[in-house]
Amino acid sequence: MVLSNVKIFRLKSHRAFRIGPMIKAVAGNLLVKRFYQPKLERIPPASLLLKQKIRLAQNGSTTSTENPISFSQTMSEIFSVLQPSAPDLDEDKTSGLKRDHLLTERLNNGELGVIMNKFFNPSSTHNNQLIDTNILLQNFPKLSGNDLDLLDFAINEKMRGNWNDLKQDFIQLWYYKSFGFLGPRTQFVLTNSSPSLRSQFLKLPFTEYNWFLLQNNKNANILPADVQNVVKVFHLDDKRFTWKSIDPFSKAIISFVVFVSIYVWLDESAKQKTKELPAQKSTVISE
C-alpha cells in the first residue's frame, strides 16, 4: 500500500514537472500577444481595399432580404414605385466600385503620366514646369472620355493628400479641367460684343478682365494688348434655391415624401411602445 502511494506520488509529480513548463510557455505567448502589438508599416493597396468594398457590397445586396425592413429600405421602395424606370441602387454602387477599381489600376500603372507626356509636351512635364498655353488649348480637346475619367479620378485622389507634392503641370491641368481658360467666373454675356472682339478674348487664356463692363459698353474698342490692363471684377450670382422657385409637381413629391416619412416614424415608434409594455408588465409581475 505504501509503495503504491509512493508510485502514484512520483507519477503525479513527474506529470506536474512536465506540464508546468508547458503552462508557462502558453501563458507567456498569451501575454506577448496581449501586450505586444507590432506596428504594421505596410498599408494595404487601394486596389485591395476596393475589391473588399465590392465584395461587401455584393454580400450586402444578397443578404438585405434577410434583415428586417428599415426606414431606408422603405423609402427606396417608395421611390421605386414613383420611378419604375430608376436604376437599382445596389447595382449602381457595385458598378461604381468596380469602375473605381479599374481607374485605380490605371492610375497605379502610370497611365496618367503617359497621357500627359503624349498630349502636353514631355519636356515640361519632366521638369515640373507649366504646360505651354498653346499646347494646352490645342491638345486638351483631343482627350478621349476615358482620359478625362482618369484625370477626374486622379484629381479626386490627389486632392486628399499634400498639395505641396503635386507637380505644377498637374495643378495647371486640374485648373483648366475645372474652370477653363476663363477661370472660376459665371454668367459671361457674349451677345453685345462683335465677333472679332469675342474671338480676341477667346484667344487670350488666363488673363484678367472685366467682361461685364465691356458687354455694357457697346462702343468698346479694346486692343488685345490692352485686355490685361482691364480691372478684374468678381461677379457673385444672387440666385439661390428657394421654396418659391420649385415647380408644383416637385412640391407635391417633396410633401408626399415628408408625409410618408412622418407616418413611418410614428408607426415604428408605436411598435416600439407595444414591445415595451409586455416587458414592463413582466417586471411588475416578477416583483
UniProtKB/Swiss-Prot annotation:
Where are the bilayer-spanning segments? 250-266
Quick check: keyword rRNA-binding in the entry?
no
Q: What does the UniProt keyword field contain?
A: Membrane, Mitochondrion, Transit peptide, Transmembrane, Transmembrane helix
Can you tell me which residues the record assigns to a coiled coil? none
Transit peptide start-stop:
1-24
Primary localisation category: mitochondrion
User: According to its record, how does it sit in the membrane?
Assistant: Single-pass membrane protein
Query: Any idea where this protein resides?
Result: Mitochondrion membrane
Residue pairs linked by disulfide bridges in the UniProt entry:
none
List the record's Gene Ontology CC terms alphabetically: mitochondrial membrane
Record's function text: Involved in respiratory growth and required for cell survival in the absence of prohibitins or GEM1.
**Protein family:** Belongs to the GEP7 family.
Q: What is this protein called?
A: Genetic interactor of prohibitin 7, mitochondrial
From which source organism is this entry? Saccharomyces cerevisiae (strain YJM789)
